[in-house]
UniProtKB/Swiss-Prot annotation:
Protein name (database record): GTPase Obg
Entry similarity comment: Belongs to the TRAFAC class OBG-HflX-like GTPase superfamily. OBG GTPase family.
Name of the gene: obg
Pfam families per UniProt: GTP1_OBG (PF01018), MMR_HSR1 (PF01926)
Cofactor: Mg(2+)
Amino acid sequence: MRFIDEASITVISGKGGPGCVSFRRERFIERGGPNGGDGGKGGSVIFETDPAKRTLFDLRRQKIIRAKNGMPGLGSNKHGKNGVDLIIPVPPGTLVTDQETGAVLFDLTEPGTRITIAKGGRGGQGNKRFATSTHKAPRFAQPGMPGEEFHLKLELKLLADVGIVGLPNAGKSTLISKISSARPRIADYPFTTLTPSLGMVIPDFGEPFAVADIPGIIEGAHEGTGLGIQFLKHVERTGILIHLIDVSQIEPDNPLDAFNLINTELSLYSATLAKKPQLVVLNKIDLTGSMEKVEQFKKAYGTGELLTLSAATGEGTAKLIQILARQIAEHKPLERKSETDHGNK
């Protein structure tokens, strides 16, 4: 399944500055020759692939991106100041298409790549350029050339930075709806979620990041039980795992039963998957008797880091977002591969 982040924008490069009509004005020289300078070049709009960028969130809010115009030429043959190029960072894997035709214009895959999307207009020539042997005092100059304007659609195949795993009914859908933009179907029975959901989390500090709610993994998932293989493939492509546990289901005689079951399925499917960083989160602490269950789990779990929260009430979710934002910032950005074959959507 593809998770697509999209943005529709208009990019406009800067107009060239007009040339100047000017003549030398010096003492004792009644009729100086033309000395109008050329106008400055308009600024270009440039896309640069930046591995620190994970989403198109900022571009979705901008809509119109406009570079600076070039400045007019000046007397004394002074060239007008060029408009500053506008460099827009985009995530690697961004596909740029024409909104009207759907034609693929650029496929930005390599970090650090710079592509001029809209070239700035050329500055107009000053009147000095038009002086000839027969027309020594031209009183006109050239206007600056207009910039370019394009209506673009940007697409990014998202790889979730964070995957939420846990047994059915652990509260994954409720949690992702609380901390992100995702709105999955939620009900109080197992297997409500039958397909992965993706939500964007906007932390107070740091870059937005993507969280995937991976449908309930059950015993035998690595062998294909339920939709096991399909779900585990999604987990494999995330960077960090939230291991979500329903405290109401913790058994006093074996508090780590659910925790061990999920980790066993992950390790049997892929050794790489089993080594992914995990943040253990105990959910539903708003329920009666939950804190006793939390203590039972902590005692069996040992000194490892874990977090308690209630996805239903929101208690503890702000802290979870802070921890995830910090952990993601400490890891290298996920490698993204752009796919131009839209026929397999």
